[in-house]
A protein has these predicted regions:
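N-terminal glycine-rich phosphate/pyrophosphate-binding loop and immediately adjacent elements
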Residues: 34-161, 166-168, 321, 335-357
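Conserved redox-cofactor binding core of oxidoreductases
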Residues: 129, 165-277, 461-471
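FAD cofactor-binding and catalytic pocket of flavoenzymes
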Residues: 111-136, 140-143, 147, 161, ...
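A glycine-rich dinucleotide-binding beta-alpha-beta segment and adjacent secondary-structure elements
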Residues: 440-507, 513, 517
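Glycine-rich loop(s) and the adjacent beta-strand/alpha-helix scaffold that form part
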Residues: 57, 61, 66-85, 281, ...
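A conserved short coil-to-beta-strand element within the FAD-binding core of flavoproteins
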Residues: 274-287
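N-terminal secretory signal peptides and thylakoid transit peptides that target proteins
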Residues: 1-17
């Protein structure tokens, strides 16, 4: 059943947004009156959460501006859930869409996957470019709301290959351990993944990969495995075992509002403004930054517009959001001296999705939380790390689904089209081809080692075998050491910082949010030590 706010709840949403905007204005003035630099954090994903916690723990007051909803405060629907199951989408599922737009577009070539929904400020957003769709999380917590929770630390030698400008020993001794601890990362237990019916699909795909000589691994996750045990035995409300993944997760997943953001909010020094988009950023003659803000309600009705001035601005809107704002400012002259490298070195983390007909039972019960992967990773361009993704259709489809991360050497570039007032992305199937080739070689070997198996060509758009047109892992555009200095401050623009996936040049070999978190931890330590917010 679709959630439809009545007049009273709609008024509450509008009033809440207006109150949040007023609170931001008041807090900014107070911070300035007290002699503190006025600090804005645009976005509330991994980098923004780390920045907020680091600053507030040092006594700074910050304004955090988030374009989506505060789902922690959202009322539950009539079924007791605030978030949707993948098989039962509502207007809470997607960001202002008339219809869901999931990575799988059909089953057997038939339009059984996506459903019509109401338009509202739902959890999963889609940024569309000519040849690429980027999935993003919308709401307080950013991508942590909509991802599968796979929390993977990259192989150190590959990290050094991708980011030689950073001290790998420092990252692996200090910042990756800190990031994993603060995110609540844990390895999946054998009693769940190794034996339960919910992971039969993973065990089968791992066994078939082993016949081809490929290793499997249990992949750490931010899901509460003890909670999943209770779900399994019917002692807790099903969430990860109830089909909740990309449209949000009610109970088991340790999203940022339950971890790093919770710590920041507990200081009382974060002034959170939700349902508010930063539409432009301008650097004024005195070096301060003027932000144009637009606030809407859950249905998209305009609540108000405002202008706020800050001494320091932290861009944490994700690769797409951060690049869009900065490229617009560069093209219009709103911020002078932005580096020419802005928008470059972008990539989809080599994401390629593929499905196999596995010719054996995968199970009608499938956990929505991925916990295993198979790999041949050796840092070459043939490398593949393939997440064993669930297919929670409620029946045994005998399909193995994989989200492959490849070591594609190609990069894309964001540019600003002044005539259309929009950002464009230079990426196409030719640039994606090395990733497709690596994934094909990998999966060909698995099929050859398992007679009777084959590719499934009925799940993706245009009946593609290898889905190379979307990504969950947008990276790059404002790379550390190129567009920013080695601490994340934009070159030539003092007081402007980047603290999200834009810092990573296009790929990192694994699901990237642990790396984004670790780099943000490192950068904030250095920036605070250097007094850049004083």
């Amino acid at each position: 059943m679709s959630f439809t706010p009545n007049r009273r709840s709609a008024l509450k949403l509008t009033a809440a947004a207006s109150a949040a905007s007023a609170l931001t204005a008041a807090s900014t003035s107070t911070a300035h009156a007290n002699g503190q630099k006025r600090i804005a954090i645009i976005g509330s994903g991994y980098g923004g959460a780390v920045a907020a916690r680091a600053l507030t723990e040092k006594g700074y007051t910050v304004d955090m501006i988030e374009m989506g909803a505060d789902w922690e405060k959202m009322a539950a629907k009539s079924n007791g859930y605030k978030f949707d199951q993948m098989t039962s989408p509502t207007e809470r599922s997607m960001w202002f869409e008339n219809r869901t737009d999931m990575p799988l577009s059909s089953i057997g070539g038939l339009d059984f996957v996506n459903r019509s929904i109401g338009r509202a400020a739902g959890v999963l957003g889609v940024e569309r470019f000519a040849n690429m769709k980027v999935y993003v999380g919308k709401g307080v917590g950013g991508g942590s709301l909509a991802n599968g929770g796979m929390a993977v630390t990259p192989i150190q030698s590959y990290f050094q290959q991708v980011l030689p400008q950073l001290d790998a020993a420092e990252m692996y001794n200090t910042y990756f351990p800190r990031a994993n601890a603060n995110l609540g990362v844990a390895t999946p237990p054998m009693d769940i993944v190794g034996t339960s019916k919910w992971y039969q699909f993973s065990r089968l795909s791992a066994a078939q990969a082993a016949k081809a000589g490929f290793q499997h691994q249990f992949v750490p996750n931010v899901y509460d495995w003890d909670y999943m045990r209770r779900e399994n035995f019917g002692r807790a409300t099903r969430s990860g075992l109830g089909g909740q993944v990309i449209f949000g997760n009610d109970y088991g997943k340790k999203t940022l509002p339950k971890t790093i953001l919770a710590t920041a909010f507990a200081t009382g020094k974060v002034n959170l403004t939700t349902m508010t988009e930063v539409t432009s950023i301008t650097q004024q003659a005195d070096g301060t930054f003027s932000l144009e803000l637009k606030t809407i309600d859950f249905r998209g009705n305009l609540v108000g517009v405002a202008k706020k001035v800050y001494d320091r601005v932290i861009m944490a809107a994700g690769s797409v959001g951060t690049n869009r704002l900065l490229l617009q400012a560069q093209a219009t002259g709103a911020i002078k001296n932005l580096p020419a490298t802005l928008g470059t070195n972008w990539g989809p983390n080599g994401n390629i999705m593929v499905a196999r007909n596995v010719a054996a039972a995968t199970g009608g019960y499938q956990s929505g939380i991925p916990a295993m992967g198979v790999s041949n990773w050796d840092n070459s361009t043939n490398s593949v790390f393939a997440e064993l993704a669930p297919f929670p259709a409620g029946i045994d489809m005998r399909i193995g689904l994989y989200l492959a991360i490849t070591n594609n050497p190609n990069k894309g570039k964001f540019t600003w089209n002044q005539s259309t007032g929009s950002m464009e992305l230079d990426w196409d199937s030719v640039k994606a081809a090395p990733g497709v080739a690596a994934a094909k070689a990998f999966m060909d070997k698995i099929n050859a080692a398992n007679p009777g198996t084959s590719y499934n060509t009925g799940l993706f758009q245009d009946r593609k075998t290898f889905a190379d047109y979307f990504t969950y892992h947008p990276l790059g555009g404002a790379v550390i050491g190129e567009t920013t200095d080695l601490n994340g401050e934009v070159k030539g623009v003092p007081g402007l910082f980047v603290m999200d996936g834009s810092l990573i040049p296009g790929k990192i070999g694994v699901n990237p949010f642990v790396t984004i978190t670790a780099i943000a931890e490192r950068n904030m330590d250095r920036l605070l030590a250097a007094g850049r917010f004083s």
